[in-house]
């Protein structure tokens, strides 16, 4: 499916761009935009980035002109140093360098705040977690959509690919350097240690393997198993 469907955050047919710049605090939602771009490039599909996103265009309104802002009128209007441009550049490089992000199978992952009860994020704003797996390579993406509170918890990973104490390398964070991100190592969960709630309403037990992750508000991380 990922080879045939184009995915996007916004386009010229929508009434407003995905990125919102509040008049009173223009950069309040910058991290949400870079988080969304990272998810766009990591999820299944062919990512399509609407022009101007990388330059922070944020028009809204009922007329077509509201989301078709002119980018080329001023001299040197395209800023290669813009933080959004740099984030897109980094995420695109990660996608290009990781075949699992282009061709891998996709699995949404249950999460836990206490290390015992796991399930899909049931609160808003929540935490999005998924894996892309190709052969023996697993990429884990975790996004904390809460703009105010951080998140510390665990994400289930593939049991067969992740022996206890497996470590993950941080390929991307939209908020800080890779060295500052707290992640792993993988923990073993015996059958009597976990309760896994599935999207269809079913409940199962372990054994399972879980990856500890700590995220800042509006932070997304892309991780690769070593």
Specify the residue positions occupied by each region the protein language model found.
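Generic alpha-helical structural context detector
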Residues: 7-10, 38-41, 89, 93
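Conserved interdomain hinge at the start of the Helicase C-terminal
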Residues: 33-34
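Carbohydrate-interacting/catalytic domains
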Residues: 28-30, 44, 49, 53-226
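Active-site region of glycoside hydrolase catalytic domains
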Residues: 2, 37-46
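Active-site clefts of carbohydrate-active enzymes
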Residues: 2-26
């Amino acid at each position: 499916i990922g080879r045939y469907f184009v995915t996007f955050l916004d386009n010229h047919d929508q009434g407003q761009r995905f990125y919102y710049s509040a008049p009173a605090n223009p950069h309040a939602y910058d991290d949400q935009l870079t988080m969304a771009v990272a998810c766009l490039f990591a999820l299944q599909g062919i990512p399509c980035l609407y022009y101007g996103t990388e330059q922070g265009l944020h028009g809204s309104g009922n007329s077509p002109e509201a989301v078709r802002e002119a980018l080329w009128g001023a001299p040197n209007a395209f800023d290669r140093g813009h933080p959004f441009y740099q984030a897109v550049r980094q995420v695109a490089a990660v996608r290009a360098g990781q075949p699992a992000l282009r061709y891998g199978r996709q699995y949404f992952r249950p999460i836990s705040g206490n290390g015992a009860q796991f399930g899909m994020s049931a609160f808003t704003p929540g935490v999005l977690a998924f894996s892309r797996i190709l052969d023996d390579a697993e990429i884990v993406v975790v996004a904390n959509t809460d703009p105010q509170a951080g998140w510390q918890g665990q994400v289930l990973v593939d049991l067969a690919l992740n022996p206890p104490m497996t470590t993950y390398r941080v390929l991307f964070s939209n908020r800080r350097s890779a060295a500052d991100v707290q992640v792993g190592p993988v923990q073993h969960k015996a059958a009597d240690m976990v309760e896994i709630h599935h999207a269809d309403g079913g409940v199962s037990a372990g054994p399972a393997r879980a990856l500890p992750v700590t995220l800042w508000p509006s932070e997304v991380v892309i991780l690769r198993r070593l």
